Amino acid sequence: MKKIIIGNWKMNKTVHETRDFIQKFDIFYSKNLGKIKDNLDFAIAPSFTSLALISTSKIDKLKVAAQNLSQFDSGAFTGEISAKMLQDLAVHYVIIGHSERREIFKEIGEDLTNKILQAQKYNLIPVFCVGESLSEFEANETEKVIIGQINEVKSVLNFEKAIIAYEPIWAIGTGKTATAQIAEQVCKLIKNNFGKNIRVIYGGSVNSKNINELLLQKNIDGALVGKASLDPEEFVKILANI
């Protein structure tokens, strides 16, 4: 199964800063071309304002990902961005269910289900995020939480095409990383319960120093990278260290 790396920029980088990133990324990538495996997929999820710029990269393999989408198809929904609009911008992947969306914007199962349906309708690949809080982790409730989150959407999610991203909330942007063994255990849990051929990736303080150990695990098929993906040189190092 192909490994995949997706950079999630969150609410960072202006259009000008994105142009600068792409120029530097192209240079660093070309210099490290011999170190990057041919069977590696990779994408960047910038803010909506910079989506079109990712496609200006000279590196054809770099795909465009979106951080969110509307649960509605079109119409009077001020401020929303539809799946059709994303498709028109050559978006390949879309992140759904990130813990920040669940916690800050109170997205629940019904919202996520509708977003998945919209993504799949327009041939976008959902990157469905699951993860437990620190208190849930310490209470040994990880399995219950992860299985429960996937069960909420399993009736509509096309597991053969979708990606499941395991991101323990306690490891997002904290500098804390689940050990490779913990990440492997949860990714294996997901595959055992929902299908061996599902693409399952890990997210949570991933960088060029820990990416190799993480992806050496049998059931981890890639990574969702946050802060480290904002630096073009570091992002290329991640790709080269797999």
From Swiss-Prot:
Keywords: Cytoplasm, Gluconeogenesis, Glycolysis, Isomerase
Source domain of life: Bacteria
Keyword flag DNA-binding: no
GO BP, sorted A to Z: gluconeogenesis; glyceraldehyde-3-phosphate biosynthetic process; glycerol catabolic process; glycolytic process
Residue positions binding substrate: N8, W9, K10, G173, S205
Gene3D superfamilies, per database record: Aldolase class I
Class in the EC hierarchy, top level: isomerase
The keyword Lyase is annotated on this UniProt entry: no
GO terms for MF: triose-phosphate isomerase activity
Known catalytic reactions: D-glyceraldehyde 3-phosphate = dihydroxyacetone phosphate
A single GO cellular-component term on record: cytosol
EC number: 5.3.1.1
Described function: Involved in the gluconeogenesis. Catalyzes stereospecifically the conversion of dihydroxyacetone phosphate (DHAP) to D-glyceraldehyde-3-phosphate (G3P).
Family: Belongs to the triosephosphate isomerase family.
Assembly and oligomerization: Homodimer.
Protein name: Triosephosphate isomerase
